[in-house]
Design a protein with these regions (language model features):
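A late-sequence structural motif
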Residues: 129-166
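Residues at or immediately flanking beta-strands
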Residues: 2-6, 86-90, 137
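Ligand-binding "clamshell"
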Residues: 23, 33-48, 119-129
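Secondary-structure junction motif
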Residues: 55, 62-83, 150-151
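Flexible hinge/capping segments at coil-to-helix
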Residues: 35-68
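Short secondary-structure boundary segments
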Residues: 31-32, 51, 113-116
Length: 166
């Protein structure tokens, strides 16, 4: 079909703003559960630290985080505050791949999707007093799901990302 596809990649908060300004027809984002998407799947998260250069035992705990208003940042900081652990930002990036690599190489502890776990990571959890965070999903939004081209693209994304129709 004759379609122009413009792809925008960015932090969830930036994509949401573009969606609200009606600059996007289709949006695939990670989000906390809440707003009902066209299709979605749970996004399991893991607390990750470096296996070779563990950081969780440090005081303050160095953290690997998205920038302000980035995903998982609030969950990480609130959890450590609740545990009475002091922390500092060891590395910040808007890139999921960069965060995963930085954590694996010992720059700090992070909370990322399970799919970002690298062989150089160790998974943290109950033994460290860290809770399971299961409140996020990968969500697909479509402005006009009954429009043929948008529907075709949405169906392709549902298949590609292993989403489930809502």
């Amino acid at each position: 079909p004759h379609m122009r596809l413009d792809v925008m990649s960015g932090m969830q908060v930036e994509l949401r703003r573009a969606w609200q300004r009606e600059e996007l027809d289709i949006m695939l984002i990670k989000q906390p559960y809440g707003e009902r998407p066209l299709a979605s799947r749970p996004e399991p998260l893991l607390w990750l630290d470096s296996a070779a250069y563990p950081c969780f035992e440090h005081s303050p705990v160095p953290l690997v985080l998205f920038p302000q208003q980035g995903l998982y940042r609030e969950e990480i900081c609130q959890t450590l505050d609740g545990l009475g652990r002091s922390w500092r930002i060891g590395y910040s990036s808007a890139s999921l791949v960069a965060l995963s690599a930085a954590s694996a190489q010992g720059l700090g502890v992070t909370l990322l999707p399970a799919s970002c776990r690298l062989p150089a990571h160790r998974v943290l959890g109950d033994q460290q007093g860290l809770p399971v965070i299961d409140t996020f999903e990968l969500a697909l939004f479509c402005r006009q799901p009954d429009e043929a081209l948008q529907r075709q693209l949405a169906e392709a994304l549902v298949t590609f990302a292993d989403l489930h129709w809502q």
